[in-house]
């Protein structure tokens, strides 16, 4: 990234998308951490359930303590700065230090200036390469890896196993209740690699905070040529909109295949409701004229369909659903091909 034009182009366009991906995934994980099971037959978030330790600020939850973020393969640190901004906004964390590691000294100099303007301290570690170089010593409340993992051992037949070893070692640098965020491109090959790694990490004792509502095997992996990614609507900065017009790029949605993980057992994922789902597809129209979405929950993937115009109370909510929405589906009808809206069905968006 030391080539000035390439870095300049990144700052004008992709910096903002990586920032948005980070913020959105952290927000998704926080929402999921509150989605604990109600008493039987109820829906919605259990008020007073509280935030899991993975989202408590600093040592012993104190907002006065130093909150430490490790950004690996940071570049100009969009992910680290987004995490700092998010934790400050969500939990009023005051003192934030970002340790940013990258091969490019120039990128980290820019990152330091950007972090300073965001009210965070940034410690530069350069030149640094993931794999050969050691992880900077310390205990971190949040570790972020933005579009780095797919570059590691990318042509090696045992790349998934080697990445698992890398992540397990990285977990030793997490503070109690700390979280790890991995962002990858929303592409088939990189996505399936991350999902395969996800399954191995779950078996190794990691917990998926987002986007998954299951700690079982990823159902997308079992289907050939399938992956899973998250979409986020955003309002691009003016410079991004202008570059879109000039280049023909379409960034109405920010997309990523990503995981938010923790080793904390207090996530209570076993308490998640059976009727809690993530929307993992775009709306589709089947041959019978029914509108269909694919949901993913504790039991895996399942279709939810409706014949629009039936006038059921949940139809309006159903028509507004988008990929990545977290929803409760109460009293759906059971069809041979999955779930369907009925007269008593209720949909609640988190």
Predicted segment positions?
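Conserved SAM-binding loop of SAM-dependent methyltransferases across substrates and taxa
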Residues: 76-92
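Conserved beta-strand signature within the Rossmann-like core of class I S-adenosyl-L-methionine
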Residues: 176-184
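Class I SAM-dependent methyltransferase Rossmann-like catalytic core
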Residues: 2-33
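C-terminal lobe and adjacent flexible extensions of AdoMet/dcAdoMet transferase-like proteins
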Residues: 240-350
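Class I S-adenosyl-L-methionine
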Residues: 192-195, 206-259, 265-266
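A short SAM/SAH-binding and catalytic strip from SAM-dependent methyltransferases
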Residues: 141-160
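S-adenosyl-L-methionine
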Residues: 109-136
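A short glycine-rich, Lys/Arg-flanked "PGG" loop and its adjoining helix->strand segment in the class I
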Residues: 161-177
